[in-house]
C-alpha cells in the first residue's frame, strides 16, 4: 500500500517515518471521524442512550452491579458469565465482551439508537 501526497506538502527527511500516526492520511481520517462525531451528535447520543440503558439494567435483580459511562457499560454478576455470553451470541446474536470471569462488557457503537437499545434489553432479558 502507498500514499500519494499533494505537492503542496513538502516532504522532509524523517517527516514520514511512521506508518501508524502523524502522517497526512491518518490525520485526514481522524479529522473526518471527528466531523462525523460532531455532525451526528454522537457524544450526546451516547450519553442519552447510555443513561437509559444504565437505568433499565439496574432493574434486573440478577445483576450484582451496573456501572458505566455513556455506552461503555459493565454488568457484574455473582456467577461466571461464560454461559450467559454464549446464550447471547448463539441464541440472540448479541455480541458482548468480558472483563474477568464475572463482568459482562457492553460497548456498542456511538450511533446506537433507542430502538436498538430496547431490542438489546428484550434479548438480554430472554437469556437471563
What would you call each of these model-derived segments?
Residues 1-128:
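Conserved N-terminal phosphate-binding loop of PLP-dependent enzymes in the Aspartate aminotransferase
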Amino acid at each position: 500500500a502507498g500514499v500519494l501526497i499533494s505537492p503542496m506538502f513538502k516532504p522532509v527527511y524523517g517527516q514520514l517515518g511512521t506508518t501508524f500516526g502523524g502522517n497526512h492520511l491518518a490525520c485526514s481520517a481522524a479529522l473526518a471521524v471527528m466531523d462525523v462525531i460532531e455532525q451526528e451528535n454522537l457524544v450526546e447520543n451516547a450519553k442519552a442512550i447510555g443513561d437509559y440503558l444504565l437505568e433499565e439494567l439496574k432493574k434486573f435483580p440478577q445483576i450484582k452491579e451496573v456501572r458505566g459511562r455513556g455506552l461503555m457499560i459493565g454488568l457484574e454478576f455473582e456467577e461466571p458469565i461464560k454461559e450467559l455470553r454464549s446464550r447471547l451470541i448463539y441464541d440472540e446474536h448479541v455480541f458482548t465482551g468480558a472483563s474477568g470471569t464475572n463482568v459482562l462488557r457492553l460497548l456498542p457503537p456511538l450511533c446506537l439508537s433507542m430502538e436498538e437499545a430496547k431490542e438489546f434489553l428484550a434479548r438480554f432479558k430472554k437469556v437471563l
